[in-house]
Amino acid sequence: MKDLFNAILRLLVKVALHGYFKKIIVEGRENLPENRPVILVANHQNALIDPLLLATHTRLNPWFLTRAAVFTNPFVCKLLHLIRMLPVYRLRDGFSTIQQNQQTFDSTYEVLRKNGTVVIFAEGSHSRVRNLRPLSKGFTRMAFGLKEKYPELEPVILPVGIGFSAHMRSGSTVRITFGKTIPVDMPSSQSGKLTKSVEKALKAIIVDIPDQDYEATITRLIEHEVDLTSKRDVETFLETGAVPNPVGVVNGLGNKLMKIFNFPLFALWLWKKPSVKDEVFSSTWKFLIGFTLAIPYYFFLLWLAMDTALGSWGLTFLLLAWITLWRNKNPQE
């Protein structure tokens, strides 16, 4: 029953994500392994949005290791457990909590033993900066711990890159790229070698702009209409000055109309925004507000159209709310 509910929830979240984003591009599906333990290692740029995208756009039905700090909100906590997320505690969460990680790792070993998939965001935290930060050792500990406990298993690491045209805006583009798998076929003494292999694989599939002159580079890319989610387009422009697939200029009118016809949802975000201390969570809260309240809002408009004197006015407003939501588009940033 729980698996059925999880499947239904993932379907609803997937539909909602396609309503929130203008375009979701998935590359490298042919690299998804079958019938073996998979440790999926991804970069982390957009808080809860990242795991939601991976939960809904891979057939692997993965479990997630997520920093324990996001489990504090009761509603979010229930949602996280329902979509197969497990907490990872760090020193900043308190030394006494670190011991709870062993229980989490034991749970992941059981998932992997059954040829399941576990996702870990190896950078350890999220950041909107478009480059790869140093990887933590959590995924190597998991891989070698699994091999020690179940020597007969043949786990692989699947690198995944996630890139956004505008991290904090709806109506933007997101690109998910699955890289080639990396076998865990070395002794634990070579964990550093495994880390470097995964780091190299991730850098090969994500937009990785050096810290030096970072802001100036981003500004140039946006001014020349380069797709910020495409590693190939970004590298082509930086090397040759050519723009293979310009994204065009977005005037923002569609976004303004969406806010007008979906004003109750936008107003709730304006109320919530001052309490969001970490701006990277902005997109997460916008999505959660839409996911939980958009359908009730549309049913309210439908009721106005069907059962009140407003009649055709209510129906017109409902149609415009839907249309402007699906036509919503924001510029890159």
Language model regions located:
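Catalytic core of membrane glycerolipid acyltransferases/transacylases, capturing the structured
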Residues: F5, L32-T97, L270-K277
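Membrane-anchoring hydrophobic helices of lipid-metabolizing enzymes
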Residues: M1-I39, L52, T58, K231-N255, ...
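Residue-level signal for beta-strand positions within conserved beta-sheet cores that form or flank
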Residues: K22, L60, H81, L153, ...
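Non-catalytic C-terminal accessory region of glycerolipid acyltransferases
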Residues: T97-V250, G311-N328
